[in-house]
Amino acid sequence: APFEPRAAAIKAGKLVLQQIHEYARRGMDFAFETTLSGKSYANLLSELKSKGYALHLFFLWIPSPELAIARIKDRVAEGGHHVPAEDVRRRFVRGLRNFFRYESIFDSWMLFGNSKAAPVLIAKRFNGNQEVLDHQEFFKIVGKWATLK
């Protein structure tokens, strides 16, 4: 509902989870977008893994919630949906924390820097082999994560 954006966001999140469970029940392949900030992802990912799903993560990193807030402001000016600044800040912290918390669950992951016009691959892990392509940026991210623990 346009006058109750938080209620609409909660309802939308529940619908996404229902759809994921339905796809998994049918054994269908699927992808979904998330901030990775929710509390239920560890259980969901473990459940999908136990059903034989291969899990692949593309994580888009930005250095600050302020950049996300500025991008949201631009999106709203173009007719997109608004996200309150306090939600952005909370999700920023949780999303980064959960990337490092859950990264071992994924069969593969790619970590992109997303502060420029196009995403830039910083690090990746495939078949258990991790490779850091941009050490300076990767250690900046690890340092940010360490302050959030």
PLM ranges: what are they?
Residues 102-149:
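NTP-dependent small-molecule kinase module
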Residues 27, 51-56, 105-108:
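Short glycine-/polar-rich loops that comprise or flank the Walker A/P-loop
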Residues 23, 48, 102-103:
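A generic structural signal for well-ordered alpha-helical segments
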Residues 53-98:
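A glycine- and Lys/Arg-enriched "phosphate-lid" helix/loop adjacent to the NTP-binding pocket
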Residues 43-47:
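A short acidic, amphipathic alpha-helical/loop segment
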Residues 32-42, 62:
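Acidic, metal-coordinating catalytic cores used for nucleic-acid/nucleotide bond scission
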Residues 1-28:
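Conserved substrate/cofactor phosphate-moiety recognition/catalytic segment
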Residues 8, 12-16, 37-40, 68, ...:
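Helical mechanochemical/support elements of P-loop NTPase systems and associated helical scaffolds
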